[in-house]
Amino acid sequence: MSYLILVRHGQSIWNLENRFTGWVDVDLNDNGRAQAKKAGDLIKEQKINIDLYYSSFQLRAKNTLKIIQEQLDDNKKVKFAWELNERHYGSLTGLNKDEMKKKLGEEKVHQFRRSWDLRPDPLDKNNSYHPLNINTYKDVPVEKIPDTESLKDTYERVIKYYSCLLYTSPSPRDNPA
């Protein structure tokens, strides 16, 4: 039987501060590291042999997976893909969610966060939080880097990546070494 295990990163420093994070490289906090350890323990309890690991480029996701692999005593290589990144929140990036509700109104912030095809205003390319200014994304083609994304944009990016994986990547079990 094949499994697809999806794990969200553990709590990050900005999650705790209630900030829009998006593509900014924010690390896990202590609680996030404990959550990742627990996720690893839960997977280990199920005795699932994991063939392939994939992660977004984001530090919080990478470190969550690293901790999970430590719990599983598994050092298989990981395929990192920017296409698996979280949604890019545009001009909301780095801002406190509660402060933005006071400034823009709760309904407007809710629309930005939950509407299918509404994008927040784009993040200025000169902003230090823009992916063009973050070393993590230096090898991503500039035309692929968004200034903002809707949920629909994010969905389409991630589904396109998963679809390519599902239809082009054979399981290592199909081709034993």
Regions inferred by a protein language model and the residue ranges of each:
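Extreme N-terminal starter segment of soluble prokaryotic enzymes
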Residues: 1-4
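Glycine-rich N-terminal loop/short-helix segment of MobA-like nucleotidyltransferase
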Residues: 11-26
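Short, basic/glycine-rich phosphate-binding loops at helix/coil junctions
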Residues: 18, 131-142
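Short catalytic helix/loop segments, enriched in acidic residues and glycine
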Residues: 24-37
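Phosphate-coordination/substrate-recognition cap region in phosphate-metabolizing enzymes
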Residues: 39-131, 137, 148, 155, ...
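Single conserved hydrophobic/aromatic residue that forms the stacking wall/gate
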Residues: 167-170, 174-177
